[in-house]
């Protein structure tokens, strides 16, 4: 059966999203992805509250669908849109309802949020969590000022490995081979793209490239982030501590 795809944008990203919807349609041939709008044109603090509120509404909308239709739904959420996906799936899981799948792009939700493990029960296929340890916005914006300086899922990936959540680390090199804009040449300068690497286009482009391939082939080393963006040191596998 053909999937029904809803794309949920992040903060201050309410459209148009024709370019992103086209990319998503290319990843899932035969589908017509739709934009799921929500009230995100506010301050960050208010938009976080709105994201949590709209997740309840979306869960109710999905729960009210005929089961056959709900089983075709794929949610794709970027940044706060990823947060909405997690909260929505958690509410569905509590009611023993499921959609087909969810794809998280740079999800702006703490990596220790209790709704994350609950969300695994809300999909039939594993959740794909595209994360980037080098995401500038998440690392220096969200990680430093958002929600008690707790590191986000979009940087660290899932803390507890689970067969229904597949972390896909996006390499920092994706910015070099992806155009950020089809119209503005300035936006395609490498310096601009590296700073703007939170943009959904980079995450979707990597997903498109890797569909059907080995996601781990060029994946970066995932280094968990601590509070205030202090990275845990990486110990060489040949080095052992002895008493």
Feature map (PLM): residue ranges:
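Serine-dependent carboxylesterase/thioesterase catalytic core
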Residues: 3-159, 221-223, 228, 232-242
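C-terminal catalytic-base region of ester-bond hydrolases, centering on the histidine
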Residues: 138-243
């Amino acid at each position: 059966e053909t999937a029904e795809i809803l794309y949920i944008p992040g903060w201050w990203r309410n459209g148009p999203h024709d370019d992103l919807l086209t990319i998503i349609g290319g990843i899932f041939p035969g589908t017509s992805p739709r934009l799921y709008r929500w009230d995100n044109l506010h301050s960050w603090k208010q938009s976080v509250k709105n994201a949590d509120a709209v997740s309840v509404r979306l869960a109710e909308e999905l729960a009210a669908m005929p089961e056959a239709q709900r089983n075709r739904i794929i949610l794709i959420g970027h940044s706060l849109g990823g947060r909405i996906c997690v909260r929505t799936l958690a509410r569905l899981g509590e009611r023993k309802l499921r959609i087909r799948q969810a794809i998280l792009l740079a999800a702006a939700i703490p990596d220790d949020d209790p709704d994350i493990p609950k969300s695994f029960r809300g999909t039939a296929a594993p959740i794909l969590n595209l994360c980037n340890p080098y995401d500038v916005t998440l690392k220096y914006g969200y990680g430093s000022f958002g929600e008690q300086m707790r590191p986000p899922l979009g940087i660290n990936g899932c803390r507890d490995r689970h067969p229904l959540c597949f972390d896909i680390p996006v390499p920092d090199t994706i910015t070099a081979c992806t155009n950020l804009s089809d119209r503005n040449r300035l936006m395609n300068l490498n310096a601009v793209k590296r700073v703007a690497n939170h943009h959904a286009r980079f995450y979707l482009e990597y997903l498109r490239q890797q569909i059907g391939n080995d996601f781990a082939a060029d994946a970066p080393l995932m280094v968990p982030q601590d509070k205030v963006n202090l990275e845990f040191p990486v110990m060489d596998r040949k080095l052992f501590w002895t008493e």
